[in-house]
Amino acid sequence: MLLLPLSVLILLTQPPRSLGAEMKTYSQRAVANACALVMCSPMENGLPGRDGRDGREGPRGEKGDPGLPGAVGRAGMPGLAGPVGPKGDNGSTGEPGAKGDIGPCGPPGPPGIPGPAGKEGPSGQQGNIGPPGTPGPKGETGPKGEVGALGMQGSTGARGPAGLKGERGAPGERGAPGSAGAAGPAGATGPQGPSGARGPPGLKGDRGPPGERGAKGESGLPGITALRQQVETLQGQVQRLQKAFSQYKKVELFPNGRGVGEKIFKTGGFEKTFQDAQQVCTQAGGQMASPRSETENEALSQLVTAQNKAAFLSMTDIKTEGNFTYPTGEPLVYANWAPGEPNNNGGSSGAENCVEIFPNGKWNDKACGELRLVICEF
C-alpha cells in the first residue's frame, strides 16, 4: 500500500520531460517488488500467495538506451544580421549603351605656354660697299711702337783699325823636353907635354855629349781690353743699323703696308681672284694674309679701309665644307665672322669657299672667283 503514495511523490518531484522514463522504471520496479513479496508462478499452477513485507530497494540498474528523437520544434526567431561579406568578382561587361546627345560647348581653356623661339632665318646677301666717307679729323699721335725684330745680317763692313797693344801676358807653363841639340864646341887645348916618341896616328875621337837646352821663353795672352772695345764698337753699329732699318721699314710700308710683330702686310692696291692672288704673293716670296690674332686683324682692317676695298684672306673650306683652315691645313686659331656667317650662300656665284675681310674687320665667306683686293703677308 505504501508503494502507491511513494510513486506519486516521485512523479511529482521529477521534471515533465522525464515523466515517461520514470513511469516505465516504476512499472518495472513494481512488478519486481511484487514478485519478490509473493512467489510468482504461472497462472496455471495456482493462485499467487499473499503479499509479503516490502523489501529494500534494489541496486540501480544500467542506463537504458536513448529514446526516439522527438518531433522538430517550431522555427526560432531570426538572428541579427551578420557582417558585410567581401566584395564579389566583377560581373561581365554589359553591352554599350546608346550614344548620348552632344553636350554644350565648355568654356575656352586658358592660353597655352608660348612655344620656343624659331630658328634664326638665313642672313641676307652682302650689300655693295658704299661710297667712301669724308675723311675724319686727324687723330692723336699714337703711342710709340714696339722695337722691331732684328733685321737681316748686313754685308761685312770695312776692316777696322788695329787695336791697342795688349799687356804682357803671364808666363806660360813649362814645355815638354826638346829634341837633342847640335854638337858642342871642342874643349880648350891642354899644355904641351914633353915630346915623346912619335907614335902611330890615333883613331878618330867619339862625338861629344849634347849641351843643355835653354829655358823656353814666355808667351803673352791677347789683350782683353782691346777685345772689349771691339765688342762695344760692334754693339753700337748693330743698334745704329736696327734704328736705320726701322725707319726705312716705316717709310717703305707707308701707306700701303702694316707691320705687326714679325709680320708685314703689304698691298699693291689691285684686285685679283683668289687663285691669282695666291700666285702673286708666292712669286713675291710671301703668302696671302693669314690673321691669327686681333692685332693682326686690325692691321688688315686699316689697309682695307685705306683702299676702300674688301680683301681676300688665305683661309678656305675647299677640302671640307664649313671647316675653314689655313694653307698649311691647320684649323683656325682666330676668327672674326660677321653675324650669320659663314653661310655658303653664294647664289649665282657658286659655293662660297673663300674668306674676305671688310673695312670694319668682320669676315664673310665669298666665292673664290670674285675679284678682291690682294694683301700679301711677309
From Swiss-Prot:
SMART domains: CLECT. Transmembrane segments: none annotated. Gene3D superfamilies: Mannose-Binding Protein A, subunit A (3.10.100.10), SFTPD helical domain (1.20.5.360). The modification S-nitrosocysteine is found at C35, C40. The lineage of its organism: Eukaryota, Metazoa, Chordata, Craniata, Vertebrata. One of its GO terms (cellular component) is extracellular space. Keywords: Calcium, Coiled coil, Collagen, Disulfide bond, Extracellular matrix, Gaseous exchange, Glycoprotein, Hydroxylation, Immunity, Innate immunity, Lectin, Repeat, S-nitrosylation, Secreted, Signal, Surface film. Residues 50-65, 204-216 have a biased composition (Basic and acidic residues). Contributes to the lung's defense against inhaled microorganisms, organic antigens and toxins. Interacts with compounds such as bacterial lipopolysaccharides, oligosaccharides and fatty acids and modulates leukocyte action in immune response. May participate in the extracellular reorganization or turnover of pulmonary surfactant. Binds strongly maltose residues and to a lesser extent other alpha-glucosyl moieties. Residues 46-222 form the Collagen-like domain. PANTHER family: PULMONARY SURFACTANT-ASSOCIATED PROTEIN A, PULMONARY SURFACTANT-ASSOCIATED PROTEIN D. Residues 223-254 form a coiled coil. Oligomeric complex of 4 set of homotrimers. One of its GO terms (biological process) is innate immune response. Residues 137-146, 173-197 have a biased composition (Low complexity). Residues 43-221 are annotated as: Disordered. Pulmonary surfactant consists of 90% lipid and 10% protein. There are 4 surfactant-associated proteins: 2 collagenous, carbohydrate-binding glycoproteins (SP-A and SP-D) and 2 small hydrophobic proteins (SP-B and SP-C). It is found in: Secreted, Extracellular space, Extracellular matrix; Secreted, Extracellular space, Surface film. Hydroxylation on proline residues within the sequence motif, GXPG, is most likely to be 4-hydroxy as this fits the requirement for 4-hydroxylation in vertebrates. S-nitrosylation at Cys-35 and Cys-40 alters the quaternary structure which results in a pro-inflammatory chemoattractive signaling activity with macrophages. Residues 260-378 form the C-type lectin domain. It comes from Sus scrofa (Pig). Glycans are attached at N90, N323. GO terms for molecular function: carbohydrate binding. The modification 4-hydroxyproline is found at P78, P96, P171, P177. Disulfide bonds join C281-C376, C354-C368. SUPFAM superfamilies: C-type lectin-like (SSF56436), Triple coiled coil domain of C-type lectins (SSF57944). This is Pulmonary surfactant-associated protein D.
